[in-house]
Structure formats: structure tokens, C-alpha cells
Amino acid sequence: MPIFTFSTNVPSENISVDFLKSTSKLIAGMLGKPESYVAVHINGGQKITFGGTDAPAGFGQLLSLGGVGGEKNRSHSAKLFKHLTDGLGIPGNRMYINFVDMRGSDVGYNGSTF
């Protein structure tokens, strides 16, 4: 059930559906989860300042049932930051990503929980 949400001031029209699809594949591979469970939501065109300027910036979170935490997050961070920098042009020092390990009982899906 990995869910990646990311808000950025990069204009929405500069964020392609192909970028969302490649983000989905990246996350599935990083976490070893079936891509059929991965959800990606990128909120472009947001009013965001970072460090007092409105230069390209963003912040987000990756929620998952397992696969995140501790040293794993260093590797996840490196891969996600490179992907976001390459795809959206946001420098690594103008982003934050929170990694959240969810409990199955706290995640609803298809009328039940995991």
C-alpha cells in the first residue's frame, strides 16, 4: 500500500503522467512491493516557499506497510531525491520527504484493513 504524496511549486503542466508512472515503478522496486498497490499523488503548482524563496521546492511523504525505516530510508532518500531532481528540476537541498511505516490495521483498503 505504498502511498507517495509530494507537493511542489513546479507548475502542474510541467509534471507529466509519465513522470507519475515512473515514480510508481521506482517506489515499487525500492520497497519490493507490487506496483498494483502503489499510489502516487503529486500536487504541482502549489504556493510554496523554502528557505525564504519561491525557487523550485517541495515536500512529501512515503507511507508504507513495512519497507521503510532506519537505514533503509537513506537508500530510499537517495533514489527519490535523484528522481525528483532529474524529473522536476528541484535541487535536493530544497526538498523534504518523510518516511512513515504504517500498521496494517490503520490502513483501509477495499472495505477492510490490511
UniProtKB/Swiss-Prot annotation:
One of its GO terms (molecular function) is dopachrome isomerase activity. This is Macrophage migration inhibitory factor homolog. The active site is at P2. It is found in: Secreted. Its EC number is 5.3.2.1, 5.3.3.12. Its main location: secreted. SUPFAM superfamilies: Tautomerase/MIF. Coiled coil: none annotated. It catalyses: L-dopachrome = 5,6-dihydroxyindole-2-carboxylate; 3-phenylpyruvate = enol-phenylpyruvate. Keywords: Cytokine, Isomerase, Secreted. Substrate binds at K33, N98. Tautomerization of the methyl ester of L-dopachrome. Inhibits migration of human peripheral blood mononuclear cells. It is an enzyme of class 5 (isomerase). Belongs to the MIF family. One of its GO terms (cellular component) is extracellular space. InterPro entries: Macrophage_inhib_fac, Tautomerase/MIF_sf. Pfam families: MIF. It comes from Trichuris trichiura.
